[in-house]
Every structure is written in structure tokens, then in C-alpha cells.
Amino acid sequence: MNTSVESLTHKMQRAAVGKMVDVVLSHADKDRQKTVGQLVDVAKQFYGSSFSAEAYEHARQTLTDPDSKWSKLINCVLDQTDPNVARTMALNLGYEAFFRGTKTIRENRVKYQCNIPWLILFDPTSACNMHCVGCWAGEYGHKNNLSFEDMDKIVTEGKELGVYLYMLTGGEPLVRKADILKLAEKHNDVQFAIYTNSTLIDEPFCKEVVRLGNIAFMLSIEGTPETNDARRGEGHYAAVMHAMDLLKEHGIVFGTSICYTRDNIEAVTNDEFMRFLCEKGAHFGFYFHYMPVGNEAAPELMPTPEQRKYMIDRIRYLRSEECDIPFDPMDFQNDGEFVGGCIAGGRNYFHINSAGDAEPCVFIHYSNANIHDQSILEILHSPLFMAYHNGQPFNKNHLRPCPMLENPELLQKMVHETGAHSTDLQSPESVEHLCEKCKNYAANWQPTADEIWSHTKIRESRYENYKDWKPSQPIEK
């Protein structure tokens, strides 16, 4: 398509979606449902045959039913969100990332014959004002920073490939507040999401976030004051509570980032905790299985097979219509069946640390590419990233998706074959040392995972970025 025509079409589509969003925001609860249903039709224009007619109809019925859990959740979020924040997020995350971006990404995967991610994760800084037990982030050291120009390059080049969602981690990203706000203002058509320990969120910062509208937050919290502060330090829980109050008061979208361990798994998933999060204003959250990454890791924090099975059952219950808690939890390790297994290596995301090293995953600290020397596209063609591209899925049981945690022999093989180096500049960890910590875990988890998987409905979603295998092929149990 001619570039000028494409640009005009883009502007017209964005304006049309913007009008629909304005209608949704101007009505309350039940009156919104008709327009929300029309957004399903917009999605169909972009996704086409990627989903079945039944899937589109199910989505339409669910979102237009005022009594469905998901309608109630959407209304709950919209009612407490500042209009500018809600509108900007709907356009940037909804239209640009989900609709238009996904279409562009799929085209580019075919064009460039490599993984093209849906989101890019990067660390503005390695500096952090905390030192949590078992955390790998501190092992990068505290002197590395991506310059504003580095971050601008990441977003600019990512957008050219269709990437309109950027997540910021660290270290503590808000050590770089000023540059983050500057970046969000320059790239006002993308959505930013920040993983933060909450301690640097204050009133002036919240006002700027509302003005810009394109920043959301994931706050680190781990259950009760006792379970949280035992790992994150005394006073951290109180800081999170204060940040939640500020964000809710200003109508800023935020969720939670929860690392579940052997010690806190019930505390971070029980009904009381989930309802408490909703009352504080959080209605979605990411759950992360503790990973034994780094020389200072604490492998004893990894959940038992029984605990992991509990987690799978619990998260699925919390998302079901049977549960009346308006909260949408997502489990990075256990939701593989919905995304076709491992999403790292650029398949759906990758990570750039504060030294510029491009890593397949935030938990895989090995690389042979750097944003200072290479473009995003060159990174995606680098040896380690292509090893991911050619090797995914790493296991046809998507409850055993990771080449480190559940298939440690595969990560060792890829690192050795590609010559990737450790990116932990302060305390480099050999891939043998890392994977040795996962061997017993993987062996112990396999029987339980295989038993669950044998009764799991196979998702027939389109995973066109797998090189050789498609979900329509027979799946080994």
C-alpha cells in the first residue's frame, strides 16, 4: 500500500475507534455494552480468520452481557479510571497494539523470517533502592543505565515492526522518572507499563501520568504485611498501600506483580487478598513463578509440584464465571496453553537490560547482541534469538514451556551452540550452574504436568511464528 494512503487509513481508523471509545466512556454500565460489542467487529477486521466465527460470537456475547464477569470487570475499571487515561489506553493498547500492531507483526514475521515480538521489556536502570531476598535484579550492579537516546531507539525501531507495548523493569525504573515521562510524551501513540516497587510514586508524578495518559503500573506485592516484608524489607508493604491510594485517587490504571514462592503461595491467592486488591483499585495482576536466577538465588523458594498444581487450579478458578471477584490474574509460567508455550526470544517478547544486552527473557541472562551496536531487527536475527525461533516450542506440553526451568538441558545447548555470554556483569553465572538448580525441579514437576496436560483442552489458536510445528499437528502427551 502507498505510504501516504496507509498513513491516512491509519488516522481514519484510529479516529473511528476513538469515537467508539468516547461513547463507551460517556455511558454508564449497561449502556456501554452495545458499543463494546462493536469493538469486537473492529477486532475481526484485523484478526480475520485467526479466530473462528464462534470465538468472535462468544466474545461479543460475553462483553455485551451486563451480568457477565468480564462486563462487570470492564465497567469497574472504567468507572475508576481518569477519562484521558482510559481513552489513551484504549487507543494505544487496544487499537495500536492489539489490532493494528498484531496485523503488522504477523506480516513482518513472514517478511523477515524471525520472531517479531508483541511487546518489548527494557530496564532504564540497574539501580534499585531495595534488596529483596532471592532477587536477581541486583546482580546486574547499580551503575548501568540506558540513555534516553537508547530508550527512544528501542521504541522507535519497535514501532516500525508493529510493537506498541513497552514494559519497563529494573532495578527500579522510577529512579529514571524524568526520562520515562519524556519518553511517554514523545511516543504518545504507544502504551507503557512499569513494574515498580512503588516507593517512588508521589503526587507530582501521578499528575504527570494522568496528563500523558499512556502509562500503567504493576506494583510488586506479596500477600500480607508479614509475607511481603519478609522478602522485600520492613516498610515496603506500607509503601505499596500508599502508592495504591495515590494511583486510585488519580484514576491511574494499575495492577500487581506477584512473585509466588514456596512460602507465600496461599497468601497471594486467597479470596481475602484478592478482594483486598480490588478494594484498593487493582483489577488485574501478573503472577511469576520464583526463578532460581543468579548466584545469590534461593532455590528453596521454588514451589513444590503440589503447590504449582494448586496455582494452576486457583488461577483458572479466579478467572472463571464461578468466581465473583472482579480481578483478572495472569500466570507467566502456567498459562502456556493459551499462548503456545514459551513466548521469549522475541516470539512474543524479549528483554533489554540496563547495559543494552538483549536477552531472550527477563529470566535468561545470556546474550550475544546489544542495542548499542545493533538494531532491534538485527537482535532478532542474532544467534541466540534464532535458536529460540528454531527451537520453539521447547516442549509440546505447554505446562513445561521453559528451556531453563522445565527443560534445562535445552538452554545449556543453545547457550553453548550460539556462544552467548552471561549478562550478569557483577556476578556472572555459568549456564551449567543455573541449569543444575533446575534439574531436580524439572524432573519432579514432569509427572504432575503430564497428568494435567493429558486432560487439558488443546488450544487451536494461531501460532504462525513457530518454525516447524503448528498446534493442528498431533501433540505428544
Which residue stretches match the model-derived regions?
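Radical SAM enzyme [4Fe-4S]-AdoMet core and its adjacent flexible, acidic
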Residues: 1-61, 229-345, 353-355, 359, ...
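Short, charged low-complexity linear segments at domain edges
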Residues: 96-117, 329-332, 336, 370-386
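Short cysteine clusters
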Residues: 128, 132-135, 342, 356, ...
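Conserved alpha-helical substructure of the radical SAM core
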Residues: 36-204, 477
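Short loop/turn microsegments at loop-to-beta-strand junctions
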Residues: 120, 346-348
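Radical SAM/AdoMet-radical enzyme domain recognition
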Residues: 148-168, 174-289
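Secreted/processed peptides and extracellular or luminal domains of membrane proteins
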Residues: 134, 138-141, 348, 367, ...
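Flexible mid-to-C-terminal extensions adjoining Fe-S/redox cofactors in radical SAM and related proteins
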Residues: 2-12, 16, 23, 27, ...
